[in-house]
Amino acid sequence: MNNEPLRPDPDRLLEQTAAPHRGKLKVFFGACAGVGKTWAMLAEAQRLRAQGLDIVVGVVETHGRKDTAAMLEGLAVLPLKRQAYRGRHISEFDLDAALARRPALILMDELAHSNAPGSRHPKRWQDIEELLEAGIDVFTTVNVQHLESLNDVVSGVTGIQVRETVPDPFFDAADDVVLVDLPPDDLRQRLKEGKVYIAGQAERAIEHFFRKGNLIALRELALRRTADRVDEQMRAWRGHPGEEKVWHTRDAILLCIGHNTGSEKLVRAAARLASRLGSVWHAVYVETPALHRLPEKKRRAILSALRLAQELGAETATLSDPAEEKAVVRYAREHNLGKIILGRPASRRWWRRETFADRLARIAPDLDQVLVALDEPPARTINNAPDNRSFKDKWRVQIQGCVVAAALCAVITLIAMQWLMAFDAANLVMLYLLGVVVVALFYGRWPSVVATVINVVSFDLFFIAPRGTLAVSDVQYLLTFAVMLTVGLVIGNLTAGVRYQARVARYREQRTRHLYEMSKALAVGRSPQDIAATSEQFIASTFHARSQVLLPDDNGKLQPLTHPQGMTPWDDAIAQWSFDKGLPAGAGTDTLPGVPYQILPLKSGEKTYGLVVVEPGNLRQLMIPEQQRLLETFTLLVANALERLTLTASEEQARMASEREQIRNALLAALSHDLRTPLTVLFGQAEILTLDLASEGSPHARQASEIRQHVLNTTRLVNNLLDMARIQSGGFNLKKEWLTLEEVVGSALQMLEPGLSSPINLSLPEPLTLIHVDGPLFERVLINLLENAVKYAGAQAEIGIDAHVEGENLQLDVWDNGPGLPPGQEQTIFDKFARGNKESAVPGVGLGLAICRAIVDVHGGTITAFNRPEGGACFRVTLPQQTAPELEEFHEDM
């Protein structure tokens, strides 16, 4: 094969060398619970145990399934570690015992499981990571909804937010992933038969999470995720040394763009084919020594075709190789592209016996070719209007080269005439060939052709008898002339090609040096002005162009950072359009192409940070594909530098905000501590005074009761300040326990009973609804929400608490029929020190709802606010429901 072998990736070889020291991870992957992941894992473990492998069961959840429990027979089970937590004993995986036991393989069910507080790692996947680092192989299971990248997608489909997730990099790093699949109808039948959940849970699951539409969507996500992983494995394997053939595992298209007319038709045909096949496609153009002979019009057509391909979804590249077919085949093999799309001109010149398609088929017969007919014949190079000046400049150089060629031939002839007596005439041919090489080296192909012809004529006139005429006395000299002409043409052509390759190499070295120097200069920039000055300096030196960097001000209006002299004023409307759309405008684009400048957006990722306006001295030089690609790379470097400044500024603001918050919390905590003791004493004295005056029947008993109530309100405010400071500093431990919802609500109502003028409407689910919460903290949430309703809805307003279980979540609403929330403040009302109506006479500092959100967040839930259609406000708390303990265990804990 004519292609050079691909060199192995050193990083990949290092990874392969280090791989055997780490345990292997095998993931049994499924769409949802009940598809048979655990059973498949145990079946594989039983097969390996029969082969003599040392296997230990670390954690396997049978969920009461008899067939799953039966698969555990014969397997060694590692005892779970029981640890005390708030008076209860929780069983968790014993990581230290597993490391001490060091089996060859350990089974770890439910990869996304969250460990109990006090464990070494908060997540089970972190336990597995430590096992792998110790060289122990691991089998585990996970559902698609637990992958971090798909968590939002799944919640959008099912309406249920899954809290336990696994980072995608950990899943992707698994050595093997086994997809365990089950059709939705079969899975629903298993649910009905009680093979997944117990009867009551199964009925609710079928109506909510396990709806057929949900199962189909989850199944598609699991299949796609597995297919993407398999495709990535195939690509990684193809990177191994020696894998050079294209694998036709899926349709992938490579479009070859030439300099013939009709390239845009070719691009559109490739895009249509890729769309029908649902495949990826690439578009490439190969730079050859012939490129420098193309007129600027054709170069712009090549650039336009590459841009069109990129707009239509292709990955574009510009290759460089004297042999086009070798570059195309090498690129196709590197990217596993099995279909090559080529343009077939309408006519074929008689002297071209082998076309590009023929050469491609000869060196790569395994690649499929798709030929697209070009309606127009190959365009000839004509000096028409837009390129007259450029062609004149080129012809001026060519004519100068021809004059130099003639002069050099004359000098060689004079020297050879002096040496004629010492050397044979045939040996003087070498001098003429040397002249051809010199002309080709400095002036290119056509002057070397002229030099070759003049040399042959001069040799005949001055050195072959009869001298002074073109006639020859010996027919053998005709062969000498033919060889001399042929060798001269070949040497001239080869020398011109070498000259072009040297020029290309010099250009690439210069381009690389400019990119390196620019990136180094941008890296030390500390302000947008530094970035703008650096970019304008390098654009001026590289492209011989003036430029301006435009950045948006606080109002979004684009403003220049510098004011270079002599630039054409740019159009504000077009610049704003380019910034808003993130698309280039001006010369060489489809938007305002007649202006003498080009506007390029400074984009990094999906965000546009500004614009750069470039006005070159020679617009044609800027329009050639190589220069355009270099300019686009420059703009990307500038955008990355601006992004770095933005991120640095955001980080600094966040740091300062955090420091301010810490100081404020410390001040509030200190102030609240100083106030708590006198308030406690004052409340006690007010309580005694109220009771004494009431027992005496004093008319001042009412005033004493008001004093007591105001002291109580102030005490609650101080407690809120302390709680917020404690939550923000992280200085509290969440002490969850199993409580009934009725108990928590009743306790909160009892605390507020003196301040409630009317009873609360309650609508709670069936008795003994268990919630896993920190009792005092969650009571504080209900107290704050009810106090908020009493304050803003009025003492005579109707207030209620509704609760119901929806799927895997408990939804609790605290509502009233008061004036409702101010429009647009449904989210900001939960901020610290935020109040719905700042001019309101209702006392308070705006901490109650902020504390509610903080407490709900640490419980893994959410809290939202909205106005009810029938009037009034509603605050909704959503908590994830965990599997409740068995009733007997619950009574023991109670």
UniProtKB/Swiss-Prot annotation:
Side of membrane Periplasmic, spans: 424-427, 467-474
Family: In the central section; belongs to the universal stress protein A family.
EC number annotated for this UniProt entry: 2.7.13.3
Domain Histidine kinase: 670-883
Chief localization: membrane
Membrane association type: Multi-pass membrane protein
UniProt protein name: Sensor protein KdpD
Gene Ontology terms: biological process: cellular response to potassium ion; signal transduction
UniProt entry keywords in alphabetical sequence: ATP-binding, Cell inner membrane, Cell membrane, Kinase, Membrane, Nucleotide-binding, Phosphoprotein, Transferase, Transmembrane, Transmembrane helix, Two-component regulatory system
Function: Member of the two-component regulatory system KdpD/KdpE involved in the regulation of the kdp operon. KdpD may function as a membrane-associated protein kinase that phosphorylates KdpE in response to environmental signals.
Record Gene3D superfamilies: 1.10.287.130, 3.30.450.40, Backbone structure of the membrane domain of e. Coli histidine kinase receptor kdpd, Histidine kinase-like ATPase, C-terminal domain, P-loop containing nucleotide triphosphate hydrolases
Keyword match Cell inner membrane: yes
Phosphohistidine modifications at: H673
